[in-house]
Structures are given as C-alpha cells and as structure tokens.
UniProtKB/Swiss-Prot annotation:
Gene: top2
Official protein name in the record: Probable DNA topoisomerase 2
Residue stretches in coiled coil: none
Compartment(s) where it occurs, according to its Swiss-Prot or TrEMBL record: Nucleus
Keyword Isomerase: yes
Originating species: Dictyostelium discoideum
Length: 1521
C-alpha cells in the first residue's frame, strides 16, 4: 500500500464532502488553536534555518511538522493520532477498523476540486501561518525582515498577477497592469490591457471561453509543448486556484473585436457560478480584470494584515521591475519603475555602506546584477518569465557560472598558498539578481519556487561580457578581497587545529633527525638544532658535533628550499618539511612565546652553502619564524647562522687563508694572486670532515647571532610578502653593486642588514636566471649552453647527456642537470609555438605540439649540435669584443652576445623572478631584418605583430581591448562541413593537441576532467599511503547551491574524430546543436590572447627595464648593435694591422738570416735582442689576447705541411714564458721560428700572405659599418631561406610518403584451433607453479633409472641441441606428461654469445662430442624486467649467482649455450620462444662465456686553453664524436 492510498483516511464518515473550513467555524476552540500554532511556531523558532533572500520560501520544513495540529483543528475526526500523512498506513487502517469504519470508509475517491481543497500544499503551499525572513515593500523601499504570513494566499495572488504579466509576452502592445488590494472589503483585483480573451462559445465544450479557462480545472492554452513560449503558465491550474480558494471570484473581459463585455461571478470555491452577463462594448481597448475575495477563514485569517500587504506589494514591484515597458500601478498609484536596474536599487536606497552593485543587460532575455553579500551567505533574487523563483534554480547557476569561474581563477591566483577555493565558497559571498525569459520553463512544483529546466532548453544563453566580469573582479567591488579574507581565516583556523596536540616532547621520531641527547628535557634551553642544506651538509655538521658533543647539539637536513609560508596556510598543513621542524623544535601554532623553556631546543642554527641559494634558505627560515612566532626572533641568541669559507688559498707550506665572501677574496687577489692555489667552496659538501671538525672546534669564530632591530619587521615583509612586489623592485634597483656583508669576525648580524646586503643578492641573481637580456635575448642558462657549444665548435652531433656534462664543466653551471636538460631541449625545439629560430639542432624526439614539448625523450637518447643558422645570428667576428663573466676564477660565458637582430623578439620568453616577471611573444625574424635595414637608412621602423613559425591561423590586433599595451588575438582555423559537422585544422598558439582532446572529451561528456583529476589524486594518495582528499563538497538539495559549477555543464559534442599528427591539427567534430547556433570560437576555445604588456628585460648595463612597445625595444637595440659593429671593425683592423706587421717582420727576419745579415747562432740572447732593435724589427705583444677560436681552427686547417703548422703555431706560444721581460716577449714571434723554416721559399710565401692581409685590411677600412651590418643581414636572410626550405622539405616528405603508402590496417590476427583453445584453458597461466628443483650433481647421474624416474611433480626436458626440430616449446616444461626424453644428437656445434652485448662479433664455436643425455633439473624464472633495467650494461656471464638477462640475439646467429664435459653435470638453458618476459636461470657451475670487449668510451678532446681566449675549440671539423 502506498502513502497516496491513505490520503483521505482521516476523514469523518460519510460520502458527502463537507468543507473543512465550515467545521473550523463551528469549532469553539478555533482561536485557541490558532494561538497554539503561534506558540508552537515560537518554540520551534531556534531550530529553524536562518532565512535569507534566497529562502523566501512559502513551504518550510515546519509545514510538515505543523500538519498534525492543522488537521486536528480543521477536522472533527475521532482519530487524532492518525492525522499525519507520514504515519504508518497499516496503523491507520487498524485504528479505523477499531472505530467501526468500513473498507469503503477507509478507501475513498475524491474529485479533483475536493482533493485540492483537502490537500492544498501541492498546489498553493501551506494554508497555515508561518514566520520567515523575507523581502517586503515597506517605507518606500525593500526591507528584509521577519514576516508572518500564509503561503497559500500569497500564491493565489501570484497566479493572477503572473497571468497578467504573461499577456505581455503574448501581446507586445500591452501597456498597463493595475492592482488593487482592498484591505477593508477583503478583495484583490488585477487588470491588464492587451489582447483580450475571446468572448465566444467553445465548439467542443459548449461554454464561453472565459468560463472555460477560469472556472474549469486543467484548462490551458499552454499544452502545445512544440510551441516556444516565454510565459509562466504551464499546468492548467493557475487562476483556477484563486477561484477555488475564494468565496467570490469575478471575471470581467472586454473584447473589442466582438464588441462584447463579459462578466461572470463564481462562488462557493468555484462550485457555484452565475450565468455570464454579456453586454455591448464600444471601446477599442481590450482588457481583462479579475477580482477575487480570498476565503480568509480557510487561511486562518480575519483580514489582510500588514505583513501580507507588504509581501503582496513587493510582488507588484517585482512585476514592474521585470516588465519595465509596462505602467504598473498599485491602488491607483503608478510605481514608475522603468528598468530592472532601478528595481534593484530599491534594495539599496542611499545607504552609506551600501555595496557597489554591478549590473548588465546581457541580452533581450537576460539581465544580471552582482554585488557583495554582507552576511557572507549566498543571496539571490531571481525571476523566470516574471515568476519569482524564491529558491533559484538552474537559471541562477547558469547566470553565475562564468562569473564564479572568473572569481575563482582570480582568487586562486592570489591565494596560491592555500587550497583551491570552491565555487560554493565563492557564491557564499555574492548577492545576485537575475531576470530572464525561459522557453517553456519547468519548475519543481506548482508553487514554482525552483526552475528545473535544462540549460540546453532555455532558448538563450547568459554570457556576461568581459567588461562586466572585470568590473566584478575589480578591487572596488570588494568581492575578491572578502573571499580572500575569509579563506585565509579558514586556513589559519585549520592550521591552528592541525597542531593542537604539539608542543614540547621528550623524544620525537623523525627520519634523518640526529636529536640532541638533552633535547626536550630540563636542559632543553641549552640545546641547539642545526638545520643543514641537504644530507651532505648534515654529514659535515655531524663530524663537527663529534667535537662539541651530542648532548647539546642535534642536526636535521632540509630537502631543499622551505615554503614561503606567508599566505600559505593550507600548504603549511601538508608540508612535511615544516611540520618536521615544528615538531623537532616543539612549536605550537598560535602560541606567543615569552620564554624558550617551552621548546625542545633553545637555539636554532642555520648551516647552508655560502652562495645565493644558501642565503635564500636562511631568509625562508627567518620568514617562517617571523610569520608564526615573531617573538622568538626578538630573543637574543635564539636564531644563529653558521658560516664557512667560500674560498681558500694555499701556498707551499703556508697556512691557508679563508675568505667568507667573494668581494673580500677579489679585493685580496688584486695584490696577492701569484703563487697561490685557489680552491672554491661552493657547497658545504666541498669541506672535508676534518675541516668540519676544525670549524666546530672554533665555534665562536664560525657562528653569528641574528639580532632584532627597528626595521626588521618591515624588511622581512618586504622580502617575502606577496603584496609588496612593487617595493621589491625598488629594493633591488637601489642596491649598489659591490655592496656585501662582512661576515668573518662579526659576532652579531641584524635582520635588516641580512635582508638588504645578503638576501638582495639572491633576488638579483634570481632575476638574472629568469629574465633575459635585451641584447642577445638569452637567459643565463641559455647563454652558458650557447657558449659551451661555440667553445666546443659543436658541428657534429653528441648526446644531450654529454652536452649537459660539458656545459656544467666549462661554463661553471652550478644548478641541477634537470634544469640544464630543459634548457637544451628548449633551445632545439621547432614545433609550432616553440622557437622561430632554434639555435640547436634536434636530432631525436624533442617533443611535439601534441604535448607542448613535454613528450621529449630522455637526455641519454637524443642528440644535438649547433644549428647552421646560429652563427648567422651570433657572428663569430663579434666574439673577441665581448666582455666575459668570471666564475670560479675562470672566464666563462660573455655578459651578453650581440646578435644581428634583436633575438629577444624572435623567440620571445616567459620568466618569473623576484618581484619581476617577463612575457614576450615571438615575432617574424624577417620583419626584424627589414626594420634593421630601415634603421640603417635612418627611416622610421614599421610596427610588427606576433608571428610563430609554421602557424597557419591568424594573429590580429584586438581592437576592442582596453589593456594598456598591445594585445592580439590568436585564432585557430575551422570550417563548416554540414549543419551539425565542422572541422578544425589549426589551434590557437599555446593550445596543445592533447589538451584540446581533453577539452573535446569534456564537451562530449561533461565532468571528464574532474573525474581524471580525482583518479590522479587517488593514485598519488595511494602511492603515499594516504587517503585522497575529496574534491567535491557536500551538495545542497537546492539547485543554485550546486557546487559542481564548471564551465562545461552540458554536452555540446556528439562525437569527434582525430586525424592530427605530431605537427598538424585536424579534428572533425559532430555537434548536438546545429553549428550555426554555436559560438564555435568561444565554446571550442579557438581564440587566445597574446599580450605585449609585460616585456621586461635586463639592459646592457644589467638594469631591469620594461618596454611598452616592440618599436621601443628595437630602437634601444639598434644603436647598441651599431656601436658593436664599430668595435668589431676597430678590433679587426687592429688585428689585421698586427698580422701585416708580423708577416712583414718575419719575411725580413728570415731574409736577413738567409743573407747572413743577422747571425743567430752562438750569440747571446741580449746581443740578439739589441741587434733586432738596431735593425728596427717591431716588437709585437699580443694585445688581443681574447682572440677568436675560429681563427685558430682556420689556421690549423690551412697548415698543409709541418712548416706551415710550425709557423702558425708560434702565435699560440706567445707569452708562454711568464718570467721573461717585455723586450724578450716582444720578439718571441721571431726567435721561436724553427730553423728549417728559414728558407727563401718561406720568405716568398710570407710576402704573399702579407700582401693578402694588406688588401683585406684596406677593404675593411674602406667599408662602412652600415655596409657590414647589411651583409650580415643578407647572410641571416639566406640562412632563413634555408630554414624555410628545410621546413618545406619535411612537409613534402610527409605528403610524398602518404601518397606512396596505401592506408590500410594490418592483417587480422588468425584464429586458433579448438585444440589450442582447449589446451590453453586446461593450463592457464595463472595456475602455473614455478618449478624449483635442485641442480643435479655428478653423483646424481649415476643413480639407477628407477630412482631417476620422473614423478608427477617433476619437470623434464631433453637436451637442447642446435637442431630446431628438437627444440621444445616452453609449454612442454609445464605439461604433466611422463614421456621419455628424445635421445640427444651425438655431436653439437656450440656457439657462445654474450646476451647482454650488442657487439657480439667474436663468436666462439666448438664442436664437442656429447655424453648420453641425462635428466637435468631446470629452474625457470619469470622476469618483470623493465625497459630501464634492460638498457643497463652488465656482465651477467661472470656472476654465477645472477641470472642472465634475455636479449634477442643478432640475426642469423645460432644461440645454443656451451656446456661442460660429460664428467660434470650439464647445464641446460632453454631457448624460450613463447615469451620475452621469461628468463632462464643458468646453473651455478655453468661455463664461462666468451665476451666481446665493449667499444672504447668516447671522450672529449683535451682542452689546454688559454684563460684569455673566449673559446678553446675542442671539436674541429673532424670531430671524433
């Protein structure tokens, strides 16, 4: 039995229906009952849910709880206990039976009208009085207060009012609605003009149309669902409900077409009606007027009270606001509301602290306004086709989706340290007003409190403009700030709760902690915790602690840099590193420390590397303590730093000298450089344990106490607070180069000095690593890589892994290999969206646009070399004039290279440093070449726009953008194929293929991304052994409180097909809606923005500058480039002059010796020097010590014989004798000539070279630098032509191969026989048991055959031979058969191979007679060897304990394993062809296999370069690699 079957079980006996109201009238205790209801309501008040604007609900939970009292008061039934609808139905029947009721009396059928009167809740809501916090019209404004009202009477009024408003949507000429609420007479009338109701008889029902629609249930003009309507009526109840719940209901209709006036009166709850009165009507205006007298007794009312009138008046104002073109009047007073925006202002009338309201008319069907919620609780006032949806619905969720998403992105961006803010949390801080027109709306019930229509059926979309969203996000709105404030409060509360049980403990168990013995005890204040930078530093500290003792000193290694805890509360909770430190020290969040006795340690010592990153770690620790426990920093001696030397110098047996700062060492080196050996201590790991003990033995000398000062608070916040990024820019700009912190001998250090003199150096270095230089467009890591490639003259491919090592060694790169790997890969990538000019050549898989380069191979698999175009960009002739950086005491990369065009605009950049970030798009190098030519000619530069190599889409200026600086729109390419199909052949810049596939999956199946994210979090949590955190919050039953507020809410894509390759884009998409009805570019994200608003770079002086336009950047670059062309010309001219003089003097010298004018044998060197001076030979000292390595290689290449090599090599020996005086050095180029070069032939050749140099010199002097520049531009343009030809060849190759290759699938796999299927089922792999039988010994072979008989559990095989017919499959070793082994072949050719080597060129072949076959046990082991393990080279053959790894032997080579003589037990190895994963474990006594030696390891050419040279080319054209 269902609940519905018992709906009428509480009725009094009798089949005739009696009005419950009449019974209520006759009841003498009616007023008392009403009073008791109020009292009951008051007692339940504290438990009631707090009402808001959202909950202007006419049906509350209290309705159900009050129903029993209502039933008791309204009905005189005997069984009061059975009056509740929620009572058990069987109890009701049993109770009724006891009272003598028959089955007919228990089960009743009611007419619909009677059922409506009996159960009004379904149709109009409760008929009982209730109290709620609602908006009402009072004192000429909207007021939010507690209201006592009956929802039912409110609803019947609303039905008549909405009917009038619906006429506006049906009839556009409607002009007014007049509402009269007569409190004295107890009636309400609603009048509207517009198209009237036809006054004629319905042909089917034989009654007039007005009577049909106002006096008969289930009549409506809205039953045709194929018709798109924007009205509120739907179910055929509407106005009839007002008639049913009224004592009198008067209908008055004027029809100008039929010239009739219709008037009819209904009474007795629509049961009685008068005949219609039809009179003549001559007016041209149609109208409809409904007047009704609510049955107040039914609603427990005597009159229209103040609360009801205020509530009904508010609904009249609602209608006026939703229909601003209508003249709406209330009690003959026109309201004068002409827009929805003005209606909204009624809620905030001239308040001093009124929040700013942001309104937008999105379209003809959507109006939207958003403001900050004062109560931090979501409020909404919404209307659907003039119906007030007090509980919101899908329209509110849809209207807010874009806004909430934008706020969420903004908040999460500013609140990076905390957990992502959920949409529901954001909505709690919003108040929203929505007015919309929805086609054929669906509601949760007849009360129409919640819209339930699907968004796809709305007939329109609410898409607020970017301008509106930006206004909402503006700081003036206070929305983002309010959300951030509450989020931080929430995080801080969670943080405080997370360590509520912390504090001082005797012992703690934390991995890698070496706890002090007295820590946590009574003497804990005397203990010191040493935080070290990594494990290696901890070992140094441990060695030192052995000197001072473990009682008072503990050590704990940090994994790396600590988290910046400011605004990072949620991350702090989940940060193991910080939690460990808090536990070790015994700290508690939120506690103010006045003494150190509550801690496990009284001192915190920081021991980090003496470099920039070490300074940063110190700062982060200071920041953490200052943020959570600032009073600890004020306690003298709590925070201490341990300093170690950064440089030590050694000389013979003298005592080493230590330096603790680089400026200090450089100052010393100016006067004390000779004879000293220098050792750089970049990390603590450089120090030996012995040195560590020395440091700790003189602890007072190596520690510095931090001291609180007046400016400490401000300076620490300056360095680490996110809100002070602009202050940090000024802070770094004001730093004076050369300023350093004196450490050695200092006992105390103020926090301000540390921040302003030490930490600032890290911030500057961080920017140098992250932000490129305007001159060469390179960051430091890119410059070091390019320098190393030029130094090595990298013309032949080497592995990236090798290049990483080379760069680290030769450019003093001090960071991780992973960072350098990403740098090298990034310089070589050439897919769309990466480089316009890739300086390195990608030989291997360097990533594609499928994953944006993330799909690149490991460094050990890919190769690279210098790209041919690199030297066209960075000309070799500029190398000698560059100023180099000195690192670790040697010259490394230049401060900047000087390219032919501004490379900063060619490949762009993205970088984030301290206080600064930089984002520069890519531009066409040909445009830059053209602009440089214009600049050479003194003409103005042409504007350029972003350009990306290989991109087929369009990049256009965003004309509507109000962003300061240039903004462009990058658009993909799409084409309509049919009504519901289109194709995409290009994506906007930065949108990778894999990401786009995920977007299409989301558009096809909404929620896909969320599901993948949850799965990823679950996997990550399972690896850590923790529970995955829920990604969704608890959902509310209310539609507009739904937390799942994602951008994609409904499916748009029916299906799609992906034809994209690694370099091209091609998707064919089938849509659910017609293509023409979809905003393809927006929905499918085929447009992205490219900004020129953050072009930040270092200039040539090392200062950070921001450029507003690309033209300004080019104008800054050009004079710098011209200046360096002049420097290049001057240098080359000086060098040619020197070479001319050198060749002339050499020719004269050789000629003088040959003619015996100069005697060089048996002469003192001093006399020889004087003779050379007398003969006026030029003294030539190599001033241009920083010579181009390119010239050296060129000369070596041109040395055709030993004499040429000897003459050219003398230049490299200039200055080799450091102890010589200047006179001797000046003539070394002559005196170092070999004797066998002093010939007349050599004189002739030298004169020819001299004349050639003179000609070259003259040409150089006569060529303007502008002409030199143009030649370089021409050369670069030619290189670009070659690059374009290369790109085209790749494209043509693909097309050519596609034409030659027929597109077809692989042949289908063949079916297997039934016997094989049966065998497979009988012996499934899952049931296999690994055989483990001991290896037989020689003694076992002599056992009688009966003893060696195979049992059911023993596996036996025949001896493996070279004959394929005797080779058994692996299944034979698992088969339970007892077959005799096949006799072995008498002779066998044995081949020994190294299965691990790819170089098995030497094969040992032996032919030995075989002994009779003997049963030998095998141990077969299944291996799950990974690809990585198989890549490693190992000598398994020499290790009898380790099983050999299987590897496929080279083709056409036998793979039989050699065996021992018959006297020993034979080891048999099975050639398993069934599985690559099964590895055969050889017996312990297997014979030694012949092993082919590996090829000689490759090594770099030795470098004995001059430190004075920019490059020492280690790789000539005949590179051995």
């Amino acid at each position: 039995m269902s609940d519905s079957e018992n709906d009428y079980s509480d009725e009094s006996s009798g089949s005739e229906y009696e009005s419950p109201v009449k019974k209520g009238k006759s009841a003498p205790k009616k007023p008392a009952a009403a009073g008791s209801k109020k009292k009951a309501s008051a007692t339940r008040k504290p438990a009631a849910k707090k009402a808001t604007t959202t909950t202007t609900s006419t049906t509350k939970k209290s309705t159900t709880s009050k129903k029993s009292e209502s039933d008791n008061d309204d009905f005189s039934g005997d069984d009061k206990s059975s009056s509740s609808d929620n009572e058990n139905v069987f109890k009701n029947i049993a109770s009724s039976a006891k009272k003598g009721k028959s089955i007919e009396e228990i089960y009743q059928k009611k007419e619909l009208l009677d059922q409506i009167l009996l159960r009004p809740d379904t149709y109009i809501g409760s008929t009982e009085r209730q109290e709620e916090e609602l908006w009402v019209w009072e004192d000429k404004r909207m007021v939010h207060r507690k209201v006592s009202f009956v929802p039912g009477i409110y609803k019947i009024f609303d039905e008549i009012l909405v009917n009038a408003a619906d006429n506006k949507q049906r009839e556009g000429n409607m002009k007014f609605i007049k509402v009269v609420i007569d409190r004295e007479k107890g009636f309400i009338s609603v009048t509207n003009d517009g198209a009237g109701i036809p006054i004629q008889v319905h042909s089917e029902h034989k009654i007039y149309i007005p009577e049909l629609i106002f006096g008969n249930l289930l009549t409506s003009s809205h039953y045709d669902d194929s018709e798109k309507r924007l009205t509120g009526g739907r179910n055929g109840f509407g106005a009839k409900l007002a008639n049913i719940f009224s004592t009198k209901f008067i209908v008055e209709c004027a029809d100008s077409k039929s010239k009739k006036l219709y008037k009819q009166t209904f009474t007795n709850n629509m049961r009685s009606k008068e005949d219609p009165k039809i009179t003549s009507y001559q007016n041209k205006t149609d109208y409809t007027k409904i007047t009704f007298y609510p049955e107040l007794d039914r609603f427990g009312m005597v009159e229209f009270d103040d609360d009801l009138v205020a509530l009904l008046s508010k609904r009249v104002y609602d209608i006026a606001g939703c229909n601003p073109t209508l003249k709406v009047s209330l009690n003959d007073e026109e309201l004068g509301i002409r827009s929805f925006e003005k209606y909204i202002n009624l809620y905030f009338p001239d308040e001093e602290n009124a929040p700013k309201v942001y309104y937008e008319k999105v379209s003809d069907r959507w109006e939207l306004a958003v403001t900050l919620s004062k109560e931090s609780q979501f409020n909404q006032v919404s209307f659907v086709n003039s119906i007030c949806t007090v509980k919101g619905g899908t329209h509110v969720t849809h209207a807010l989706s874009n806004i909430v998403t934008a706020i969420q992105e903004q908040v999460n961006k500013k609140n990076k340290g905390s957990a992502d803010i959920k949409p529901a949390f954001i909505k709690n801080h919003l108040s929203v007003f929505v007015n919309c027109l929805i086609e054929n709306p669906h509601f949760d019930s007849q009360t129409k409190e919640t819209l339930t229509s699907k968004i796809s059926s709305f007939g329109s979309r609410c898409e607020p403009s970017e301008k509106f969203i930006k206004r909402v996000l503006d700081s003036k709105s206070g929305i983002v700030a309010s959300i951030l404030e509450f989020a931080q409060f929430k995080d801080q509360s969670a943080l405080k709760r997370s360590t509520s049980s912390g504090g001082k403990k005797g012992k703690v168990s934390i991995p890698k902690l070496d706890d002090a013995n007295l820590a946590g005890g009574t003497k804990s204040e005397d203990c010191t915790l040493i935080l070290t930078e990594g494990d290696s530093a901890k070992s140094l500290a441990t060695a030192g602690i052995s000197v001072v003792g473990k009682d008072h000193y503990g050590a704990f290694p940090l994994k790396g840099k600590l988290l910046n805890v400011r605004d990072q509360s949620t991350k702090v909770i989940n940060n193991d590193e910080i939690n460990n430190i808090v536990t070790i020290l015994g700290l508690k969040y939120g506690k103010v420390y006045e003494t150190l006795s509550d801690l496990r340690y009284g001192h915190l010592m920081i021991m980090t590397d003496q470099d920039h990153d070490g300074s940063h770690i110190k700062g982060l620790i200071i920041n953490m303590v200052h943020h959570f426990w600032p009073t600890l920093l004020r306690m003298p001696g709590f925070l201490v730093e341990f300093i170690t030397p950064i440089v030590k110098v050694f000389k013979n047996n003298q005592k080493p000298i230590s330096f603790y700062t680089m400026p200090e060492f450089l100052k010393w080196r100016e006067t004390n450089d000779k004879g000293w050996d220098v050792k750089y201590y970049k990390g603590l790991g450089t120090s030996t344990p012995g040195e560590g003990k020395e440091y700790f033995s003189d602890l007072e000398r190596h520690k510095i106490d931090f001291e609180w000062d007046e400016g400490a608070n401000d300076n620490i916040e300056l360095a680490f607070s996110k809100s002070r990024a602009d202050d940090r820019k000024k802070w770094m700009a004001e730093h004076i180069e050369g300023t350093f912190l004196e450490q050695f001998g200092v006992k105390k250090l103020t926090y301000s000095d540390f921040i302003n003199k030490e930490l600032v150096l890290f911030s500057i270095a961080d920017c140098e690593r992250s932000i490129p230089n305007i001159v060469d467009g390179l960051k430091t890591s890119h410059r070091k890589t390019l320098y190393s490639c030029f130094k090595r003259n990298l013309k032949k491919e080497i592995k990236v892994a090798q290049l990483i090592g080379y760069v680290s060694e030769h450019s003093a790169y001090h960071h991780g290999e992973a960072s350098l790997y990403s740098t090298i890969v990034g310089m070589a990538q050439e897919f769309v969206g990466s480089n316009n000019i890739n300086l390195l050549n990608p030989a291997g898989s360097y990533g594609t646009r499928i994953a944006g380069g993330k799909d690149c191979s490991s460094a050990r698999y890919i190769h690279t070399r210098l790209n041919d175009i690199a030297r066209a960009v960075y000309h070799a002739d500029d190398d000698p004039i560059l100023s180099c950086v000195v690192d670790d005491g040697k010259k490394v990369q230049p401060k900047f290279y000087i390219p032919v065009i501004p490379m900063i605009l060619v490949n762009g950049c993205v970088g984030i440093g301290t206080g600064w970030s930089s984002t520069i798009p890519n531009y066409n190098p040909r445009d830059l070449i053209q602009n440089m030519r214009l600049a050479i000619d003194g003409k103005p530069l042409k504007p350029i726009k972003p350009w990306y190599r290989g991109f087929l889409g369009s990049i256009e200026a965003n004309q509507g953008s109000k962003v300061q600086g240039g903004q462009y729109l990058s658009k993909g390419i799409w084409k309509k194929l049919s009504d519901n199909r289109f194709e995409i052949t290009e994506l906007p810049i930065g949108f990778w293929t894999q990401d786009y596939r995920e977007l299409l999956d989301e558009l096809e199946t909404p929620g896909t991304r969320k599901k993948k994210k949850e799965e990823k979090e679950k996997k990550a949590a399972s690896r850590k052994g923790t529970k995955a955190k829920p990604t969704t919050t608890k959902r509310s039953k209310r539609v507009d409180d739904d937390d799942d507020n994602e951008k994609v809410t409904e499916a748009t894509v029916k299906s799609y097909t992906n034809y994209s390759s690694e370099s091209t884009i091609h998707f064919i998409i089938d849509t659910i809606q017609p293509v023409d009805e979809i905003n393809i570019e927006k929905v499918f994200k085929l447009v992205s923005t490219i900004n020129e608003t953050n072009m930040v770079v270092f200039d040539e002086e090392g200062r950070i500058q921001r450029f507003a336009t690309t033209t300004a950047l080019q104008e800054h670059f050009f004079p710098l480039r011209i200046k360096h062309y002049q420097m290049r010309k001057d240098f080359l001219s000086e060098r040619l002059s020197e070479e001319y003089s050198r060749l002339s003097n050499k020719a004269r010298f050789i000629l003088a010796v040959v003619n015996k004018e100069l005697v060089i044998s048996n002469v003192k060197k001093v006399d020889l020097i004087n003779k050379l001076k007398e003969m006026k030979f030029d003294r030539i000292i190599n001033k241009n010590s920083n010579k181009s390595a390119r010239d050296k290689i060129k000369k070596k290449k041109n040395a055709f014989d030993e004499e040429d090599a000897a003459i050219s090599s003398d230049e490299e020996k200039d200055g080799a004798q450091e102890e010589q005086d200047d006179d001797t050095k000046g003539y070394d180029y002559l005196l170092s000539l070999p004797l066998w070069s002093l010939t007349l032939e050599r004189v002739k050749k030298l004169i020819e070279e001299r004349d050639s140099k003179k000609k070259e010199w003259d040409i150089l002097l006569s060529t303007p630098i502008q002409e030199i520049y143009k030649r370089d531009l021409d050369a670069l343009e030619k290189a670009l032509d070659d690059q374009d030809a290369y790109d085209e060849s790749l494209k043509n190759q693909t097309e050519s191969l596609k034409k030659r290759t027929k597109t077809k699938a692989l042949p289908r796999a063949k079916k297997i026989s039934a016997k094989v299927v049966k065998d497979t089922k009988e012996a499934p792999l899952t049931k296999l048991v690994k055989p483990t039988v001991k290896i037989p010994t020689t003694t076992d072979s002599n056992v009688s055959g009966s003893k060696r008989k195979k049992s059911d559990d023993t596996t036996s095989t025949s001896t493996s031979t070279t004959t394929s017919s005797n080779t058994k499959p692996i299944e034979s070793f698992f088969a339970k058969e007892d077959k005799k082994p096949t006799p072995a072949v008498k002779k066998s050719t044995l081949v020994s191979l190294d299965s691990d080597s790819d170089f098995d060129d030497d094969v040992v072949v032996s032919s030995k007679p075989k002994a009779p076959p003997k049963k030998t046990s095998k141990v077969i082991e299944l291996s799950d060897e990974s690809d990585q393990e198989s890549d490693q080279e190992s000598d398994q053959g020499s290790d009898p304990e380790s099983p050999p790894k299987r590897s496929k032997a080279p083709p056409k080579k036998p793979t039989t394993i050699a065996t021992k003589k018959a006297t020993t037990s034979k080891s048999k190895v099975i050639d398993d062809k069934s599985s690559d994963d099964e590895v055969i474990k050889a017996p312990t006594n297997r014979p030694t296999r012949s092993r082919v030696p590996p090829p000689k390891s490759l090594s770099f050419l030795d470098s004995d370069s001059d430190d004075d040279d920019l490059y020492d080319n280690e790789e000539s054209s005949s590179d051995s690699d």
